[in-house]
């Protein structure tokens, strides 16, 4: 199983793939992919780990579970494939980016450019049934992604954890705030964005922290034209 990960996540997660809960999770997923329409495609489940290496991670943006509509999810929280209209939460993220850092809003919602710079866009649950949000809650993914958060917390180099909404903020209990920077606000969803997400300036605050630690800032501006990688 560890051959799925071809970067420095492989050794740090090797033991996790052998644990009984993960063996059970893998069997559940095998059955689900054979009998249901599951997102993302099984080859994209670990995109967040493939694109953002363990030692290169600078920022973690936690999501909940993948988009459950056709063609949307590709393994990064909040991101959608090229050619897919940005969903409402991402539209609000773009609005905050524009007001925070002068972001030029693209037509797409493909966030690979961030992931490659060290922004880990991690959902706490990595798969979902088509049209059924939270359908893979409690099958084992939370244990796996909690382990990822613990491993990142254990790193010497400080990180920024961006926690939007109560679900993500539950993970703050794992994070050493003496070392890492936690930015917590309401979720960018249209239901909550006006309660404190807008105006929270998470992107400039992230770069201020990285700069203060002598780390490379994130270029939040996305390319205007993208192709799926």
From Swiss-Prot:
It catalyses: Hydrolyzes single-stranded DNA or mismatched double-stranded DNA and polynucleotides, releasing free uracil. GO terms for biological process: base-excision repair, AP site formation via deaminated base removal. The keyword Disulfide bond does not apply. It is found in: Cytoplasm. InterPro entries: UDG_fam1 (IPR002043), Ura-DNA_Glyclase_AS (IPR018085), Uracil-DNA_glycosylase-like (IPR005122), Uracil-DNA_glycosylase-like_sf (IPR036895). It comes from the Bacteria. Its EC number is 3.2.2.27. Its main location: cytoplasm. One of its GO terms (cellular component) is cytoplasm. Keywords: Cytoplasm, DNA damage, DNA repair, Hydrolase. It holds the Pfam family UDG. One of its GO terms (molecular function) is uracil DNA N-glycosylase activity. PANTHER family: URACIL-DNA GLYCOSYLASE. Belongs to the uracil-DNA glycosylase (UDG) superfamily. UNG family. Excises uracil residues from the DNA which can arise as a result of misincorporation of dUMP residues by DNA polymerase or due to deamination of cytosine. This is Uracil-DNA glycosylase. It comes from Brevibacillus brevis (strain 47 / JCM 6285 / NBRC 100599). The gene is ung.
């Amino acid at each position: 199983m560890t051959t799925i990960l071809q970067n420095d996540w492989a050794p740090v997660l090797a033991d996790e793939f052998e644990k009984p809960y993960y063996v059970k999770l893998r069997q559940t997923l095998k059955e689900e992919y054979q009998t249901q329409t599951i997102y993302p495609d099984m080859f994209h489940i670990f995109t967040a780990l493939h694109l953002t290496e363990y030692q290169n991670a600078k920022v973690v943006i936690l999501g909940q579970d993948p988009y459950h509509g056709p063609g949307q999810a590709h393994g990064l929280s909040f991101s959608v494939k090229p050619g897919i209209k940005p969903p409402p939460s991402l539209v609000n993220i773009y609005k905050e980016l524009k007001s925070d850092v002068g972001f030029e809003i693209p037509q797409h919602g493909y966030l690979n450019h961030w992931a490659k710079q060290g922004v880990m866009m991690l959902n706490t649950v990595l798969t979902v049934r088509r049209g059924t949000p939270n359908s893979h809650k409690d099958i084992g993914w939370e244990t796996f992604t909690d382990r990822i958060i613990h491993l990142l917390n254990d790193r010497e180099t400080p990180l920024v954890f961006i926690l939007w909404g109560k679900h993500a903020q539950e993970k703050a209990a794992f994070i050493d705030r003496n070392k890492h920077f936690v930015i917590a606000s309401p979720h960018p969803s249209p239901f909550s964005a006006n309660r404190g997400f807008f105006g929270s300036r998470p992107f400039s605050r992230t770069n201020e922290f990285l700069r203060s630690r002598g780390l490379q800032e994130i270029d939040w501006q996305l390319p205007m034209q993208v192709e799926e990688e």
